[in-house]
A protein has these predicted regions:
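Conserved nucleotide-sugar donor-binding
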Residues: 141-156
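Short, well-formed alpha-helical segments that are part of the catalytic scaffolds
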Residues: 11-26
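Short beta-strand-to-loop acidic/aromatic patch adjacent to the donor-nucleotide binding site
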Residues: 76-90
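Active-site-proximal specificity loops/subdomain of glycosyltransferases
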Residues: 35-77
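C-terminal catalytic/acceptor-binding lobe
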Residues: 12, 165-247
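Short alpha-helix within the catalytic core of nucleotide-sugar-dependent glycosyltransferases
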Residues: 91-112, 151, 169-170
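A conserved hydrophobic helix/loop-capping motif in glycosyltransferases and polysaccharide synthases
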Residues: 3-15, 33
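Short beta-strand-to-loop element that shapes/binds the nucleotide-sugar donor at the catalytic cleft/hinge
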Residues: 109-141
Length: 247
């Protein structure tokens, strides 16, 4: 069994490495999507993909590509954790400990008797970090995604709906997992999100106005928010068409 932290990373190398080190220490393998080739030190990641296109494909497409790549390379990969290079792993549980809990839980939730197929058809979001008034309760922003969920949901086109570039992709993920009865929130797990608007390191930290990091400016505009919200609201009103899982 292996668990992979699968994220795009745009932070300066030295900043990203501080976070990636924590994930590796807890037993995770790491797959990164970077915008520039050759700027990460060897040993920091297990799989690295580089954006060679004219523009960044967006968070959803990047994560989907990473998960697809890992599934093809690592038959032991059972769970994938999304988020960002500002998200830390739960410090009190190893990757394997959490993964075993999840596989047992999701297997018990289904009437099907096929362990390999259904024990990883699920999404789990740690909610112990109560940043910004517990905003994590409505989004699967640093979720654990099971191998079979990733392979089957959205008609086999990846776990994240590809229309989203940054905002609302995590809210759709949560809603879709709820729709198919395979979503679990765990307040006992803390994956601290060092959001740029975080006031302090307490799990109850409020959000305060701060300058937007350069690599996030493009995705934190009113225009992008409005565009993404329209996609989400339209899809939600129609029952998230195309989200159906493969049999």
């Amino acid at each position: 069994m292996s668990v992979w932290f699968t994220i795009p990373s745009a932070r300066p190398v030295e900043e990203a490495e501080k976070v990636l080190k924590l994930w590796r220490q807890q037993g995770y393998k790491i797959a990164l999507w970077r915008d520039a080739e050759g700027d990460m030190q060897p040993g920091v990641y297990d799989v690295m993909m580089v954006d060679l296109s004219v523009s960044y494909p967006g968070y959803a497409k990047a994560v989907n590509a990473l998960i697809t790549e890992v599934v093809g390379r690592d038959p032991s990969a059972e769970w994938f954790v999304i988020g960002g290079d500002d998200t830390e792993p739960d410090p009190s549980h190893t990757a394997e400990e959490i993964a075993r809990d999840l596989s047992a839980e999701f297997y018990n939730r289904t009437p099907f008797q096929d362990w390999k197929r259904w024990s990883t058809f699920g999404v789990m979001q740690p909610t112990g970090d109560r940043f910004a008034g517990g905003s994590i309760d409505r989004i699967a922003g640093s979720a654990w995604i099971g191998r079979e969920f990733a392979r089957r949901i959205n008609q086999g086109n990846g776990p994240l709906w590809p229309e989203y570039h940054h905002m609302f992709v995590d809210e759709e993920l949560q809603n879709v997992a709820i729709k198919y009865g395979c979503f679990w929130q765990r307040p006992d797990l803390i994956q601290l999100h060092r959001h740029f608007m975080r006031a302090n390191e307490k799990t109850t930290s409020e959000a305060v106005v701060k300058p937007i990091p350069e690599h996030l400016v493009k995705w934190n505009t009113p225009e992008h928010w409005k565009e993404s919200k329209l996609i989400f609201n339209t899809r939600k009103a129609n029952g998230f068409p195309g989200s159906e899982p493969l049999p």
